[in-house]
C-alpha cells in the first residue's frame, strides 16, 4: 500500500497537493501545525477540508514554541502584515525562520510511524514570496539529512516547485476542484477565507494567478501538464 503524509495548512497550495495525493496514493495522512500563527483560523479550515476530501487521518501538532523563538508578522500581533509590494527586495517580515525545517522534520517523523513513503509539501520556487525555505535546494538537502538520521528513505515531494500560481490553479481544475480551492481554502495572511483580504502578498499572488488562469485556460493548462507530466 502506498502511503503519503501531506503538510497541510488548508491554503491553496497544500489543498491542491492533498487533492493530487488522494489520486496518487492509497492512503493519505495530513499534518497541520499550530504555532500560534496570526492566521490560525487556517487550522479549522484544514480540519474541515481534510475530512471533506477524505484523508485517512489528520493530526494537528502543537508547536507553539516556534512562536516564542521566531519573530515574524505571522507570530507577532505587534508587527503588521505588509501590503503587497511588487518591487520589494529581501526577505519579507512574514517569513517565519525555521518553520519549514521544523514542519518537514516533524512530518517525516509522523511518516515514519505510519509507514508512509513520502512527505508532500506545497512549497514553490517559481512564484513565491522570497522565503529561503521554499527553495528546491533546501528541500533536497533537508530530505537527505532526515533520511540519514532515520536510516529510512522518506521522500520529500514538491509537486508545485516548478509551476507558478496560475498553473497551480490549473492543477486544481484538472482534478475538478477549482471552486473548492477558491472558496473553501484559507491562504490570506490576515486569516480571511476564500479570496481573502486582497492586500497581503499571499492574496496578491493567489488573485493574480487565478486571473491569469481564467483569462487563458487552455494555454495555462497545457503548460501545467507539460511541466508536471500529466496527460
Curated annotation (Swiss-Prot):
An annotated GO BP: queuosine biosynthetic process
Q: Which cofactor does it need?
A: Zn(2+)
InterPro entries from the entry?
QueC, Rossmann-like_a/b/a_fold
EC assignment: the record states: 6.3.4.20
- Could you tell me one molecular function GO term of this UniProt entry? zinc ion binding
Q: Which residues bind Zn(2+)?
A: 188, 197, 200, 203
Write out the catalysed reaction: 7-carboxy-7-deazaguanine + NH4(+) + ATP = 7-cyano-7-deazaguanine + ADP + phosphate + H2O + H(+)
- Asked if the record carries the keyword Ligase, the reply is yes
Q: Explain how, and how many, cofactor molecules are bound.
A: Binds 1 zinc ion per subunit.
Q: In which pathway does it act?
A: Purine metabolism; 7-cyano-7-deazaguanine biosynthesis
Domain of life of the organism in this record?
Bacteria
Q: Does the keyword Zinc apply?
A: yes
The alphabetized UniProt keywords are: ATP-binding, Ligase, Metal-binding, Nucleotide-binding, Queuosine biosynthesis, Zinc
Q: Family per UniProt?
A: Belongs to the QueC family.
The record describes the protein's role as: Catalyzes the ATP-dependent conversion of 7-carboxy-7-deazaguanine (CDG) to 7-cyano-7-deazaguanine (preQ(0)).
Indicate what this protein is called per its UniProt record.
Answer: 7-cyano-7-deazaguanine synthase
Amino acid at each position: 500500500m502506498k502511503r503519503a503524509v501531506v503538510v497541510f495548512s488548508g491554503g491553496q497550495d497544500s489543498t491542491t497537493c492533498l487533492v493530487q495525493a488522494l489520486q496518487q496514493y492509497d492512503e493519505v495522512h495530513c499534518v497541520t501545525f499550530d504555532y500560534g500563527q496570526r492566521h490560525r483560523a487556517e487550522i479549522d479550515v484544514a480540519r474541515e477540508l481534510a475530512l471533506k476530501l477524505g484523508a485517512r487521518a489528520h493530526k494537528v501538532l502543537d508547536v507553539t514554541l516556534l512562536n516564542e523563538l521566531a519573530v515574524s508578522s505571522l507570530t507577532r500581533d505587534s508587527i503588521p502584515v505588509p501590503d503587497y509590494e511588487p518591487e520589494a527586495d529581501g526577505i519579507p517580515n512574514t517569513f517565519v525562520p525555521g518553520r519549514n525545517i521544523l514542519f518537514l522534520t516533524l512530518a517525516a517523523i509522523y511518516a515514519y510511524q505510519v509507514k508512509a513513503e513520502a512527505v508532500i509539501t506545497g512549497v514553490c520556487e517559481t512564484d513565491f514570496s522570497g522565503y529561503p525555505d521554499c527553495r528546491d535546494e533546501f528541500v533536497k538537502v533537508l530530505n537527505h539529512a532526515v533520511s540519514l538520521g532515520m536510516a529510512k528513505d522518506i521522500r520529500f515531494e514538491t509537486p508545485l516547485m516548478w509551476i507558478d500560481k496560475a498553473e497551480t490553479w490549473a492543477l486544481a481544475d484538472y482534478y475538478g476542484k477549482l471552486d473548492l480551492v477558491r472558496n473553501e481554502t484559507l491562504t490570506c495572511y490576515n486569516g480571511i477565507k476564500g479570496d481573502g483580504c486582497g492586500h497581503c502578498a499571499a492574496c496578491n499572488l493567489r488573485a493574480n494567478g487565478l486571473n491569469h488562469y481564467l483569462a487563458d485556460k487552455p494555454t495555462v493548462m497545457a503548460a501545467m501538464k507539460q511541466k508536471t507530466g500529466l496527460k
